[in-house]
Amino acid sequence: MFNQRHLSAAPNQDQLIWKILFDRQTALLHRRAAPAFSQGLARLGLRREFIPDIGELSATVREHTGWQLAPVGRPFEPAAFFALLAERKFPIVTRIRAMHSFDFSPEPDLFHDLFGHVPMLLDEGLTDFLHHLGQAYQTQPAGSVAREQLWALYFFTAEFGLVQHEGQPRLYGAGLLSSAGEIHHCVNEHTPRPAFDLATVLRTPVTGTRYQNQYFMLPAWEQLTDCVAELAGMLATA
């Protein structure tokens, strides 16, 4: 899908890091990734040989779900991040992680965003969910508990969520899809993977500096959309 001559601007070191990460993650995700991710990856036509052009990816995403990609130099604070979601835009960090951060990157980077998030942005169920989160965040006052809860909901779904598929846990959160270390930790038999419960998720503390203590698993992909109405009710009575 992508013309390589438009992608040569990335430094050789960045291209090498992309290639190594792409190979490792696609191998690890075999029969572990959610169908929505695998389908999105195939539709985008991402390749191991070179870093894709963000503008071309954005055009493909817009064609499928109406969303756009917004290149940024570094991760946003939650308020700016959710404001973009409310506009059906997703920020893409333009720097890629260093070699020493292969297994775990505490902050989003180019690989995390392009490989982990963008394939999922071709799924209308997820993009509708993200849009609702962005809109809901905008209605809550700065510094409110509700905003903290909305961040937790985003974190334990779009970043570290699991979904049950054919009786097995499948990964759909970008923090899992893009991190070998996080995958190994998640699939460890001693790591808790409780069923997704909105009230529990909203009050679970968020940490981005280490592997997660637990990963919430949707019993079905449709529950992600269904929880939007439940969330609206909770915020209205808060």
Say what each PLM segment does:
Residues 1-121, 125, 201-203, 216-238:
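The feature captures two recurrent sequence modes
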Residues 98-226:
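A contiguous, surface-oriented mixed alpha/beta subdomain in the mid-to-C-terminal portion of proteins
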